[in-house]
C-alpha cells in the first residue's frame, strides 16, 4: 500500500486511524471531555490514550435561588483506557496543508 493510499479517508474509522500517535479530543457521556494522545483503538471506539487531561463538568441547582452552578474538575492521567460505548464524539487534530 502506498503512502497516498494509506493517508486517504474512505470510512469513518480511517479518520481516527490517521490520528494515531497524535493528540485528539474525545467527548463522553456524563459531561466528560478528554484530550490526549491516541495510542490505539478498535471498531467499538475503545481507546487507549496517553498524557490525558480529563475535564468533568457538573451542573447543580441552588436550592434557595434556583440558579445553575456550573463546576468543572480537571485531572491529568498518564494512561487511560476509554470504553467505546461512552464515546459521543472524536475530533482529530487540526491539520494545515
From Swiss-Prot:
UniProt KW keywords: Acetylation, Cytoplasm, mRNA processing, mRNA splicing, Nucleus, Ribonucleoprotein, RNA-binding, Spliceosome
Residues bearing N-acetylserine?
2
Among InterPro entries, the record links this protein to: Lsm3, LSM_dom_sf, Sm, Sm-like_LSM3, Sm_dom_euk/arc
Q: In which tissues is it expressed?
A: Expressed in roots, leaves, stems, flowers and siliques.
Q: Which SUPFAM superfamilies match?
A: Sm-like ribonucleoproteins
Cite a single GO BP annotation. deadenylation-dependent decapping of nuclear-transcribed mRNA
What's a Pfam family this protein contains?
Answer: LSM
Its family remark reads:
Belongs to the snRNP Sm proteins family.
Q: What does this gene product do?
A: Component of LSM protein complexes, which are involved in RNA processing. Component of the cytoplasmic LSM1-LSM7 complex which is involved in mRNA degradation by promoting decapping and leading to accurate 5'-3' mRNA decay. The cytoplasmic LSM1-LSM7 complex regulates developmental gene expression by the decapping of specific development-related transcripts. Component of the nuclear LSM2-LSM8 complex which is involved splicing nuclear mRNAs.
Name-wise, this protein is: Sm-like protein LSM3A
Organism annotation: Arabidopsis thaliana
Amino acid at each position: 500500500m502506498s503512502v497516498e493510499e494509506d493517508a486517504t479517508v474512505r470510512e469513518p474509522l480511517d479518520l481516527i486511524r490517521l490520528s494515531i500517535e497524535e493528540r485528539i479530543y474525545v467527548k463522553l457521556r456524563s459531561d466528560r471531555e478528554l484530550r490526549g494522545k491516541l495510542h490505539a483503538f478498535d471498531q467499538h471506539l475503545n481507546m487507549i490514550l496517553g498524557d490525558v487531561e480529563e475535564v468533568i463538568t457538573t451542573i447543580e441547582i441552588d436550592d434557595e435561588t434556583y440558579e445553575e452552578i456550573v463546576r468543572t474538575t480537571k485531572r491529568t492521567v498518564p494512561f487511560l483506557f476509554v470504553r467505546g460505548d461512552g464515546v459521543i464524539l472524536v475530533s482529530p487534530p487540526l491539520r494545515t496543508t
